[in-house]
């Protein structure tokens, strides 16, 4: 579908954006030969014509890394980025994909999802769980850091909305998302959760799954502020998060494994500081108390269960010959019956913020 520029804003200046191509594009870059020589046919420019963003395969690249200064003003592109953010950007732009059930997904999904038959129903129900909190209808659903929308369950999450706005730092993931969406209406934008290139109060609901903990710990609050800015009044922000060592249930049932995970996590941080890998998946989990401090008294925040156990629990305790399907059925029923309890003590809560 055709991109509606009226919903967009420049991620660097907050100004409106408009299309440029042909002679208008040449006039903007008349003093920059290195840009004129590139085969960029169209793009978006901000109101003051200080920054240009290319459009590739009908996907606007509204990301700091792809912004081009027109030279008309002192630019902001040299601001240093946290090395952790650079590594996450590289990770998701270098990762390969695999096709499962006619849907393209990241090939690292098997690290976090149990694909065994014994866990299939339990996993499938959890993947659909965010839908009940997103709202019954609306025009725009923002799927921030959408990735390739790598499961049929994820595709269903936007069923109550007219248009799914998929924003991700990976152009490859957006190509896969567009392919997976098929005939469903979608807008695909290369952008960052910390500087969402959408105007204020545009989206009816916002979906943020397994993303926030990959943002630097000091910038997660800013990312939350951006999610809150883009959603309409009374709109829902639905965040699927990992509590990691803040999960009481995982700490009790997986104590030795949790100690190992924490040790490995700390070792990974040390490795990154010493060897400085170009691509590395940053992770930091805040507590639920941190979210409540962010919300304060002016934001309504609720916590429910998305899935109470992680893949380590499933691989250790759940086996077909040992009644694994029976155990998971009762666990899933308990999550449905006591979502707020499991949301507070389980591995993966759904954090719902109402604006």
Model-derived features: positions:
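A C-terminal cap/extension of S-adenosyl-L-methionine-dependent methyltransferases
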Residues: 2-5, 16, 25-41, 289, ...
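Conserved class I S-adenosyl-L-methionine
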Residues: 63-135, 151-154, 238-265
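Class I SAM-dependent methyltransferase SAM/SAH-binding core
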Residues: 142, 147-195
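A short acidic, Gly/Pro-enriched loop at the edge of an enzyme's catalytic core
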Residues: 194-206
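A short beta-strand submotif of the Rossmann-like class I SAM-dependent methyltransferase core
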Residues: 208-211
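A short glycine-rich, Lys/Arg-flanked "PGG" loop and its adjoining helix->strand segment in the class I
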Residues: 221-233
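Short alpha-helix
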Residues: 279-298
